[in-house]
């Protein structure tokens, strides 16, 4: 679910007339999620089921130590020119790379503008001073998208902090989904304490399993 060029990266096909099973595979030159580097070069894959706006799925990617495995479900729909979604996502890890995240996801859109909010809890420690306590965070993102081009400003509040800007272009060639993006993240989102500027390339392919 956490593909680089979209930052989380679920695309809901709400309101379809039949149930759809699909799979996806991908690769990223650098795997960033919400402005934070997860791994330099990362393969990924996922499975999804969607029916009349309801969806459930799983997605996994290689990270520094082990695998990240996500599970998610929710509902997305449209009302006139507005789109909306609500769901749950859990982020789990097989190694020592990170601890579990769980969050409620809210989304809304109108035309080329979309707003996403995640309200979550983290089993690790954003701040060493708060070690041993579950951490709360809110993630917010504002995205403008048109004809494959997009720009996003996003950040964190509560126990987490930091913000980033991302811009890119996604397109399809020979049934492959390609993306090129640039990302500028502040020092709060860097493990080195320095700001990040990155050029990211992604490639992926989706499969209809019906």
Sequence positions of predicted segments:
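Outer-membrane beta-barrel proteins
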Residues: 3-7, 11-210
């Amino acid at each position: 679910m956490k593909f680089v060029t979209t930052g989380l990266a679920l695309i809901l096909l709400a309101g379809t007339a039949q149930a759809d099973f699909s799979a996806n595979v991908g690769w990223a030159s650098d795997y960033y999620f919400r402005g934070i580097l997860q791994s330099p070069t990362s393969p990924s894959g996922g499975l999804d089921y969607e029916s009349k706006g309801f969806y459930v799925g799983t997605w996994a990617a290689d990270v520094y130590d082990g695998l990240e495995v996500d599970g998610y479900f929710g509902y997305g729909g449209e009302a006139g020119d507005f789109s909306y979604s609500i769901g749950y996502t859990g982020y789990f890890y097989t190694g020592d790379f990170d601890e579990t995240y769980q969050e409620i996801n809210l989304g809304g859109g109108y035309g080329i503008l979309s707003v996403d909010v995640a309200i979550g809890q983290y089993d690790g420690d954003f701040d060493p001073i708060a070690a041993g306590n579950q951490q709360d965070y809110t993630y917010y993102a504002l995205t403008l998208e048109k004809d494959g081009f997009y720009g996003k400003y996003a950040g964190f509040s509560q126990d987490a902090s930091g913000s980033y800007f991302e811009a890119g272009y996604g397109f399809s060639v020979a049934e492959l989904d390609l993306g090129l993006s640039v990302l500028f993240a502040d020092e709060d989102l860097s493990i080195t304490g320095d700001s990040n500027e990155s050029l990211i390339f992604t490639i992926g392919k989706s499969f209809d399993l019906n």
